[in-house]
From Swiss-Prot:
Molecular chaperone. Has ATPase activity. Residues 349-565 are annotated as: B. Residues 1-348 are annotated as: A. PANTHER family: HEAT SHOCK PROTEIN 90 FAMILY MEMBER (PTHR11528). Gene3D superfamilies: 3.30.230.80, 3.40.50.11260, Heat shock protein 90, C-terminal domain, Histidine kinase-like ATPase, C-terminal domain. CDD domains: HATPase_Hsp90-like. This is Chaperone protein HtpG. Its main location: cytoplasm. SUPFAM superfamilies: ATPase domain of HSP90 chaperone/DNA topoisomerase II/histidine kinase, HSP90 C-terminal domain, Ribosomal protein S5 domain 2-like. One of its GO terms (cellular component) is cytoplasm. It comes from Hahella chejuensis (strain KCTC 2396). The gene is htpG.
């Protein structure tokens, strides 16, 4: 190293300061992961160099023996980890080591609770990478030179993990990055050969590159009498397998190896929920190793967030986040795909239109769905934990993936009137198996919450007849059902939309009685239409209600309350539509309504109409008018008493 130049002291981005503080306290019990994170970063840097050197071989600078080296000094209490990978320029150091260039960082930090165990999992999912060094070190130094830059354009970065860091230009002959950790006094146990070797074996055994350490108990050899022993040049040896895990036969891989490899590629602290490792030969030749995480990441609902698999071609790393191999509704899946068919100079644009990629995408999608189907069949409890984490994302599937619509539908779970809580545990196959004799439709209702759904007046006739209704209370559900028309040959029907047809569950006498009641109520229906004429499409006698006086029903193809709210929140224009007002002639309030005249009839009509709106989960357009009319009626009632 030569004399440093252009030394600057810069402040960390506010989010980095907050993350460092939280991480050091939340991850203390899992502190040994710092080595896994740093080795993973070094492995990524080697991958990137190898990829960029495909088109620019001089980046190797005459050294294509790619490796990670790990050294320690127990007296100085330091650990040094170096790689001869792509390295960083000065600007890259400031960006990568001084800021968090991730969307949603502020939102993520706001989700942290202060609970050490919970925050540890969340921070692990977010990906702490380099900053994990500060769990065990009170000072960290980084020396780095980007491949292709001159030796005197290297950078020295230093920080104690508090509010700022220093950066200066130095000379570094070899490309790549060297990180020096100055261990805290209480963490000096890590400056130990056996400890470091065991951590590399535990966490980084199956990364694609060797992690080397100095051979222990080196035989220095005998020296001539009277001469001092010469200090031998250190010999290094690989302390990991350095074989890409997915290239090994499945019967040679332990579950623990699969779990640690997942943590390496996903930067997750938790074990995966399940995985599938497959080799495909024939028309296409590729290997895939796919993982389903145990917990949803913090940015699951950000559809623009980086996603996808790590892509390798003939064992050469090509890119992270290759989203072309799985559909968006499976964006939670992590893993590796290694193809022998694609060209090494492939780009994201080429992947977009490659027929081999389309075939692989189709096969990998089927692989994930089959993996989930098997889990659902073999371990209902474990599958339920998957659904609780990722179910709402899987509900995007029927709209995106017509070919696999039925398979996705079988994986779905819903709440229903068959149960007493809001847990989504009922499959469509469960529902069909419990259908009443003569029932030919799958009935459902969408609502803002489970409680609102099960208390909806639209359910009354179904309760009376013992017909199960699915209660859909996720925001996505109404949109989902616009793309899911039938299951197992049975059509879906939203019980709050259109005409209600219970099919053969109703006998002929009931239908004839309903027609008779409708005729008798015609005078009242006409009077109601006159009052509500600008606000309703129709007024009719209900077939749904047994206990409530009235309800609102939207047209069979109109947008429901749930979907209208989503569109309103997104600032989108809503299509004009008017509901149908249904009354229950047997209800005492409706009978009383039929006896009223003039202003009192109008007031009572509007009160019933607004109550039907509220019961259906809608907001009132004129809440003050409703309160005024209701108070007026209550006052009259109290005076009459």
């Amino acid at each position: 190293m030569t004399t440093a130049t252009e030394k600057q002291t810069l402040g960390f981005q506010a989010e980095v300061k907050q993350l460092l503080h939280l991480m050091i306290h939340s991850l203390y019990s899992n502190k040994e992961i710092f080595l896994r994170e740093l080795v993973s970063n070094a492995s990524d840097a080697l991958d990137k160099l190898r990829f960029q050197a495909l088109s620019k071989e001089d980046l190797y600078e005459g050294d294509n023996d790619l490796k990670v080296r790990l050294e320690f000094d127990d007296k100085a209490q330091t650990i040094t980890l170096s790689d001869n990978g792509i390295g960083m320029s000065r600007d890259e150091v400031v960006t990568n080591l001084g800021t968090i260039a991730k969307s949603g960082t502020a939102e993520f930090l706001s989700t942290l609770t202060g609970d050490q165990k919970q925050d540890s999992r969340l921070i692990g999912q977010f990906g702490v990478g380099f900053y994990s060094a500060f769990i065990v070190a009170d000072k960290v130094e980084v020396y780095t030179r980007r491949a292709g830059l001159k030796p005197d354009e290297a950078v020295h970065w230093e920080s104690s993990g508090e509010g700022d860091f220093s950066i200066e230009t130095v000379t570094k002959e070899e490309r790549g990055t060297r990180i020096v950790l100055h261990l805290k006094d209480e963490e000096k146990e890590f400056a130990n050969g056996w400890r470091l070797r065991s951590l590399v074996k535990k966490y980084s055994d199956h990364i694609s590159f060797p992690v080397e350490m100095i051979k222990e108990n080196m035989d220095v050899g005998e020296e001539e009498e009277g001469k001092e022993k010469a200090e031998p040049a250190p010999e290094f040896e690989s302390v990991n397998e350095a074989t890409a895990l997915w290239t090994l036969p499945r019967n040679e891989i332990k579950d623990e190896d699969y779990k640690e490899f997942y943590k390496h590629i996903a930067h997750d602290f938790s074990d995966p929920l399940l995985w599938a490792h497959n080799r495909v030969e024939g028309k296409l030749d590729y290997t895939s190793l796919l993982y389903v995480p145990a917990k949803a990441p913090y940015d699951l609902w950000n559809r623009e967030a980086p996603r996808g698999l790590k892509l390798y071609i003939q064992r050469v790393f090509i890119m992270d986040d290759a989203e072309q191999f799985l559909p968006l509704y499976l964006r939670f899946v992590k893993g590796v795909v290694d193809s022998n068919d694609l060209s090494l100079n492939v780009s994201r644009e080429i992947l977009q239109n490659d027929k081999a990629v389309e075939s692989m995408r189709s096969a990998l999608t089927k692989r994930v769905l089959d993996m989930l189907s098997k889990l659902a069949a073999d371990d209902a409890e474990k599958y339920q934990s998957f659904w609780d984490e990722f179910g709402r994302v899987l509900k995007e599937g029927p709209a995106e993936d017509f070919i696999n619509r039925e398979k996705i539908a079988k994986l779905m779970r819903f709440s229903s009137t068959h149960q007493d809580d809001d847990k989504q545990t009922q499959s469509l196959e469960d529902y069909v198996s419990r259908m009443k004799q003569g029932q030919d439709k799958i009935y459902y209702i969408t609502a803002e919450s489970y409680s609102a759904g099960v208390k909806s007046p639209h359910l009354e006739i179904f309760r009376k007849k013992g017909i199960e209704v699915l209660v859909m209370h996720d925001r996505i559900d109404e949109w989902l059902m616009s793309h899911l028309n039938e299951f197992d040959g049975k059509h879906f029907q939203d019980i709050a939309k259109g005409e209600l047809d219970l099919g053969e569950v109703e006998d002929k006498e009931e239908k004839e009685k309903q027609e008779e009641v409708s005729k008798e109520a015609e005078p009242l229906l006409n009077r109601l239409k006159e009052v509500l004429k600008d606000h309703v499409e129709e007024v009719r006698v209900t077939h749904r209600l047994t206990d409530s006086p009235a309800c609102l029903v939207v047209g069979a193809y109109d947008m429901g309350v749930q979907m209208r709210r989503i569109m309103e929140a997104a600032g989108q224009a809503l299509p004009e539509s008017k509901p149908t007002f249904e009354i229950n002639p047997d209800h005492p309030l409706v009978k009383k309504l039929g006896e009223e005249q003039g202003a009192r009839f109008e007031d009572l009509t509007w009160v019933l109409f607004d109550q039907a709106r509220l019961a259906g989960g809608e907001n009132l357009k004129d809440p003050a008018g409703y309160v005024s009319r209701l108070n007026k009626l209550l006052l009259e009632l109290s005076n009459a008493g």
